[in-house]
Amino acid sequence: QTFHYSQGWTN
């Protein structure tokens, strides 16, 4: 689980 500024939480 990583945080991406424009996409939010992605798995």
From Swiss-Prot:
<feature type="modified residue" description="Pyrrolidone carboxylic acid">
    <location>
        <position position="1"/>
    </location>
</feature>
<keyword id="KW-0027">Amidation</keyword>
<keyword id="KW-0527">Neuropeptide</keyword>
<protein>
    <recommendedName>
        <fullName>Corazonin</fullName>
    </recommendedName>
</protein>
<keyword id="KW-0873">Pyrrolidone carboxylic acid</keyword>
<dbReference type="GO" id="GO:0007218">
    <property type="term" value="P:neuropeptide signaling pathway"/>
</dbReference>
<dbReference type="GO" id="GO:0005576">
    <property type="term" value="C:extracellular region"/>
</dbReference>
<feature type="modified residue" description="Asparagine amide">
    <location>
        <position position="11"/>
    </location>
</feature>
<comment type="function">
    <text>Cardioactive peptide. Corazonin is probably involved in the physiological regulation of the heart beat.</text>
</comment>
<keyword id="KW-0964">Secreted</keyword>
<comment type="similarity">
    <text>Belongs to the corazonin family.</text>
</comment>
